[in-house]
Amino acid sequence: MTNIIELPEVLANQIAAGEVVERPASVVKELVENAIDAKSSQITVEIEESGLKMIQVTDNGEGMSHEDLPLSLRRHATSKIKSQSDLFRIRTLGFRGEALPSVASISKITIKTATKEVTHGSLLIATGGEIETLEAISTPTGTKIKVENLFYNTPARLKYMKSLQAELAHIVDVVNRLSLAHPEVAFTLISDGRQLTQTSGTGDLRQAIAGIYGLNTTKKMLAISNADLDFEVSGYVSLPELTRANRNYMTILVNGRYIKNFLLNRAILDGYGSKLMVGRFPIVVIDIQIDPYLADVNVHPTKQEVRISKERELMALISTAISESLKEQDLIPDALENLAKSSTRHFSKPEQTQLPLQSRGLYYDPQKNDFFVKESAVSEKIPETDFYSGAVDNSIKVEKAELLPHSEEVIGPSSVKHASRPQNIFTETDHPNLDLKNRQKLSQMLTRLENEEKSVFPELDYFGQMHGTYLFAQGKDGLFIIDQHAAQERVKYEYYRDKIGEVDSSLQQLLVPYLFEFSGSDFINLQEKMALLNEVGIFLEVYGHNTFILREHPIWMKEEEIASGVYEMCDMLLLTNEVSIKTYRAELAIMMSCKRSIKANHSLDDYSARNLLLQLAQCQNPYNCPHGRPVLINFSKADMEKMFRRIQENHTSLRELGKY
């Protein structure tokens, strides 16, 4: 009696489904990729209950014949490869013939299809992989596949599904990646009757990016291009000032296929070099065209892992393309951006000259109990026509018209403000240990901060500053040197910690509301976690496509910090995912105190410096910044006398010590 048996085909398909169909988003990916392979120009994805109840993909592609339709549910039956040589030169997204049989084995599937060569189409209905109906019907050219009751016969898989909003976010992400990979295809995603994504299918990658990430984001992205004998690299990368808290916005495409590759991600970051702050990542869409012989996609069932020959050469090509593109830009933030309505000045980069330290005009306002920067006059006259000419305005209007969908309503600038994300206002050397993804370090830091006791601060008399960074003061214990950034960071941390801890119903109405734009998946995730934002006094309302509107702000948040502060909180919420209100508030206080504090090379006037020391003296722990760095150091009178050899231990003379 033999112990080895051949498994039934349906059971084999269900086993394969364990690898191919991880969640509803996997079904959407496989069906849409099949539609793209069928040379479709329009693809519509409709889902109900995040795909668990129903997924329907409709395309206008080539369709299937009546004879081929039942074969599509047979395992390893495909029209995309026919010989071993085809396996090493794959030009389609699918090729194994596993996806459709795997999906059919764990759901009820209905397929309507027709080719342009025949006058009628075909209908197939199967449940659990078993064909129940196969008949001729009237249907337009193309294919419509409906998947219902997903995982109905594999209840164990249902237990591992996340919330409906989380599963929907995965589906949106899949459709967005495929839209970027194939801008020539018009994609539409509809969830429970609500349209979430729509692209025009014009073939313009920049327009596809605008449809997914928003117009404001697209305006701050640069085109890149590079090529050698084996690779062609093109796409768009964001300016260093436009970053996100994770790598989810870095999209790498190889021959129209979205892939995950650690080394290529590393090459992208290398192209930016030191222009990115630590823990921040750019928005990138890079399209790589390569000879299929140099890429092996037959590595993983999801086909997202691809082995690439000459990978090091490709890395160098990507890094060079990004670095060269950034070199051509003036990366200094434009102070006249709001007036000129232009995000970047496209000037040739001038030769850099070392300038002496000069005062930045930082002053203290005793009424607001805060510092402010006094605007300084521009020393060099800039021709007014460079910024305000009609040519500039006209070009910007044309750019907006090209990127905005025709159906989108343009909101007047007087009714709302479009919030911009925070720029990189401190470098990676400021706080290399500040990384919200390192939960253990953050937890230890928060525990230490909670256990701080009130300290007694010495009475100091300020008398000077060095290099716009260190303050000098004297006290009865000698000379004190204070790090002005660390000092104000401690002051601001305790301010934000107390104010955020006092969150209640005290809100300030905004005369002009703010609009906040997000990607589709982030928009859905934030809707699910909105209660956490409400806890800290942030109430965002849905306002159009992937956009929230803020009509009021908490009183602890200064009005000039609304745009950057709300984006920072949303990024933190998306990154940490499961976070307690207590930890959320503490992390926010640490982050905002660091970003809102004065930096090095800011010269303070005497009044501002003295008030900073007064504020520091009132802190619970004035000796360390929230990250543990010392705020001040002390040289006692005895230390000074020893350094100048005014006193010697045991009164030993210099001659006795052999110095003379």
Curated annotation (Swiss-Prot):
Looking at the record's lineage, which domain of life comes first?
Bacteria
What SMART domains does the database record attribute to this sequence?
DNA_mis_repair (SM01340), MutL_C (SM00853)
Q: In this record, what's one Pfam family?
A: DNA_mis_repair
Keywords associated with the record: DNA damage, DNA repair
Spell out the PANTHER family in the cross-references. Answer: DNA MISMATCH REPAIR PROTEIN MLH, PMS, MUTL, DNA MISMATCH REPAIR PROTEIN MLH1
Q: What does this protein do?
A: This protein is involved in the repair of mismatches in DNA. It is required for dam-dependent methyl-directed DNA mismatch repair. May act as a 'molecular matchmaker', a protein that promotes the formation of a stable complex between two or more DNA-binding proteins in an ATP-dependent manner without itself being part of a final effector complex.
State the protein's name: DNA mismatch repair protein MutL
The species this protein was found in: Streptococcus pyogenes serotype M49 (strain NZ131)
Taxonomic lineage of this organism?
Bacteria, Bacillati, Bacillota, Bacilli, Lactobacillales
This protein's gene is called mutL
